[in-house]
Amino acid sequence: MKSLWNDNVAKTFANDPLQLRVYTSQLLGREAGLVLHGGGNTSVKVKTKNFFGDSEEILFVKGSGCDLSKIQISGFSPVRLEVLKRMATLDRLTDTDMVRLQRSAMTDSTAPDPSIEAILHANIPFKYVDHTHADAVVAITNNKRGEALIREIYKDRVLIVPYIKPGFKLAKKIYEMTHKKDWKRFEGMILMQHGVFTFADDAQTSHERMIYLVSLAEDYLQKQGALDNVARSEAKENLFKLSKIRRHVSRIKGNAMLVKLDQSSEACGFAGLSNVESIATCGPITSDHLIHTKPIPVILGKNVEKEITDYSSSYKAYFDRNTDGHLTPLDSAPRWGIWPQYGTIAFGRSIKETIVVSDIVHHTIRVIQWGEAIGGWKALSEKQIFDMEYWELQQAKLQRDEISPVLQGKVALITGAASGIGLACTEMLHEQGAAVVGLDINAEITQIFNQRDMVGVHCDITDDRAVKKAVEMTVRCFGGLDILIPNAGIFPDSQRIEDMDENTWERSMDINLSCQQRLLKMCIPYLKEGIDAAVVFISSKNVPAPGPGAAAYSVAKAGQTQLARVAAMELGCDGVRVNIVHPNAVYDTALWTAEVLESRACQYGCTVEEYKTNNCLKTEVSSKDVAELVCAMVGPAFAKTTGAQVPIDGGNVRVI
């Protein structure tokens, strides 16, 4: 591992130890082989003056859960050093009381909670302290010969600490091991089955000691051939089965979950190992990952429903074996899975969660194989894993009410998403928690929606291959499909039947009806495996109340409505709801050009303004109004409604 330290950059912070701490923390955070997603912690000890002008020593320690790769000064918690030092001398301290004491010793109440290892940082007698969960090091510490290998690699350079649960007990143990020792003898600490600490009175030395100690571990693994001991193979694909996996995991979890499928050669290689079940189900590479991954993955095969159900039962038995009778069980759904021939799968309530889990899994499968190559991978004991997963601070979080967006974890596909009603629906579905894929013939769609959970796809809905590819991409990206909004359509120029050219008629029938049927047909297999799946067709007031000169449009939309009604009957037994909205006078859509408005007003013998407010409520209906109705119809409010036609038109007399 190479140091990313840059003298020229560091010089700009020479007189600001806290800003220098930010800089070196970010350097560590950018190395995925050192820390992942909120893991690790750093600190700096600084003398400052309080409100009374008195000098105080303050430990600025990384706030709990803050990401080192992006941390700023606001991500550090300022805690009075003397209080933290005295805490280490206590005989007993619950973790809950530890957190309270640490917060009471903070000099800024708006800062995040200090790291649970703040006491440990405080009692290391150096200005700068760095802590990581380096892959190379934990591959060696989590080994049947772990301590012997660490001594062989580091000799007397480091203090070796046996595994103890992070928090007060770990800080107390290290305090007892070192309070009569000369810290200058050590370049760092290796915490068995946990990670690495380095320290120094200047930031560069502490940082480069970390890189050096990790490099020694990497060199050892390289010499043993471990770094090359990573299986690889090509992936197969079964998107329908993927959607079934997601459905069953969501059922166990009790809410919709997103999926991130890793089909990389490394993921497929690991999943295909003959001994994968035994080596992958020992436990995490560091207890820090438990909050994201649970103790072990689910192993998937031919009968995914049974395998996921068995995993749930096994997790409940694990809880029953270890609980003291006063703990609240976590849900029993897996957070990742091993799918032989297909790769690894991460599950999460949001795309952010799935990315965190997937990244951890990517490193986990490497570290396990490295460990196997040097004598045998060995994780923590079941009891140690349980104690960490169910420690009191985690239990306290269960008592807090977490309000999730109503569509959190759902997957939605919308056509005609670049403007008007489609744009509004896509944005609002995303706001309400869904991962969304928007299709449009406008190439700018890829720029309009370019987030990880809000994807724009350039697609002509008359191109069946392109539509099929987009549907499959949706399932591949998020694991399934729950919401379908067929919105794309055209509004032909006004033509009376006797004057209508064949192309106008055929084009309207193709885009407004036939394409909708083909899209629905492609999506049905995935919708049947969806979570409370729902389809909402964006139809038109022209179905219940057609107007002269709009035969091509009205007939196609009427056909679309009949398609939706039949679909509601056919799919009801599979739990898929199909409803229709009939908007009218939504003038912020691409359909309503100035020319179209003028033409329609002429048909009714009125001005454009009179035409736009021609409803009982004398109000205009916006795309956002339609989107709000659509979101309600795919949500729990309409959970027991299917086959319904709901007008949203301000009260059209002819419809009423």
Residue ranges with predicted function:
Residues 1-412, 424:
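Glycine-rich flexible loops
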Residues 407-436:
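Canonical Rossmann dinucleotide-binding motif of NAD(H)/NADP(H)-dependent dehydrogenases/reductases
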Residues 495-497, 501-506:
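Substrate-binding pocket helix/loop in short-chain dehydrogenase/reductase
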Residues 525, 569-570, 639:
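Alpha-helical segment proximal to the catalytic Tyr-Lys
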Residues 536-559, 564-573, 584-587:
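Catalytic loop of short-chain dehydrogenase/reductase
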Residues 572, 577, 641-643:
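Short, small/polar-rich loop/turn modules that mediate ligand/substrate recognition or access, typified
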